[in-house]
Structure formats: C-alpha cells, structure tokens
Amino acid sequence: MIQSINHVTYSVSDISKSINFYKDILKAKILVESDKTAYFILGGLWLALNEEKDIPRNEIRYSYTHMAFTIEESEFEEWYQWLNDNNVNILEGRTRDVRDKKSIYFTDPDGHKFELHTGTLQDRLDYYKEEKPHMKFYEWDEVDKTDNNRE
C-alpha cells in the first residue's frame, strides 16, 4: 500500500545556486549538503537536489508540471513581494475565479515550476462542481484521503 509521498528529487545545474535559492528564498531547512547533493525539509516534504550539469533543460518551460505548497491567504501579498524583491522568476498565472483562491507561480534557477496556493482540494472541488458540469465527480471521504480503508 502506498502511504504517502516519500520525497521529491530535482536535477539542478548548479548545486550552490540551488541551495541558496531553496534555503534563502523558500526558507527550506537544509539537512545535508555535498558538492553534488542537498537534502531539505520544505513544507514537511523531503526535497532532494542532485547536480547534473550536462542535461538539456529547455523543454521544462513548456510544461505545466509543478509542485504546489499551501500558504495562508493573509500571507499572499507578502510572499509575492518577497519573491519579487529577490528577483525570482514569477510566472504569469492563469485567470482564476475567486472561488479557486489565489496562486503565485514561479521557477527555481533551473526552471522547475512551483506554486504557492491559498486554496484546498475541497475548495477546488466545490468550485468545479458549480462551474464545470462536464466533469465527472466521485464520492470520497476522510478515510479515503489516507487510504486507511485499504488492505
């Protein structure tokens, strides 16, 4: 049985530059570092960085693939200003309905996309149920969220 996400690993082109970004900009707690690897705790998640200098990185900008972290709505402007003040590449977000809450999309030095989001999964489902009748919705409850009902 899958219990949870164990860790996320990103390939980076410059480990020192990436360590500074994750530690100083995202305020991740660094656990270990070497000349090619770094481990952090970020939002309760084990995040690993591995330096791989000689791989192409051009296609990453075309993908919507990203990792999102929850922030409080009251901290939204503060986070936006912090990223902007630190010259982080902030991306133009998609047009949103207010029921879908707020998001800031940005990239790390290698172009990996991140989102800081003020909503929850339930917020998104409630909004989609109201506005997207073409979607099929399935029932789920708190037990389903943790897979406790599976053997």
UniProtKB/Swiss-Prot annotation:
Family under the similarity heading: Belongs to the fosfomycin resistance protein family. FosB subfamily.
Q: What does this protein do?
A: Metallothiol transferase which confers resistance to fosfomycin by catalyzing the addition of a thiol cofactor to fosfomycin. L-cysteine is probably the physiological thiol donor.
Is this entry keyworded Flavoprotein?
A: no
Question: Sorted alphabetically, which keywords does the UniProt record give?
Answer: Antibiotic resistance, Cytoplasm, Magnesium, Metal-binding, Transferase
Q: How does it assemble?
A: Homodimer.
So where does Mg(2+) get bound? 7, 66, 115
Which intervals hold domain VOC? 4-119
Q: Where is the active site?
A: 115 (proton donor/acceptor)
| Entries under NCBIfam families matching the protein | Fos_BSH, PRK04101.1
Question: Which GO annotations describe the biological process of this protein?
Answer: response to antibiotic
**Subcellular location(s) per record:** Cytoplasm
**What GO cellular component entries does it have?**
cytoplasm
- The EC number of this protein is 2.5.1.-
Signal sequence region:
none
Gene Ontology molecular functions: magnesium ion binding; transferase activity, transferring alkyl or aryl (other than methyl) groups
Asked whether the keyword Magnesium is assigned, the reply is yes
Q: Which domain of life is it from?
A: Bacteria
Q: Which organism is it from?
A: Staphylococcus saprophyticus subsp. saprophyticus (strain ATCC 15305 / DSM 20229 / NCIMB 8711 / NCTC 7292 / S-41)
Q: Which cofactor does it need?
A: Mg(2+)
**Which Pfam family would be a valid example here?**
Glyoxalase
Q: What is this protein called?
A: Metallothiol transferase FosB
Q: Which CDD domains match?
A: FosB
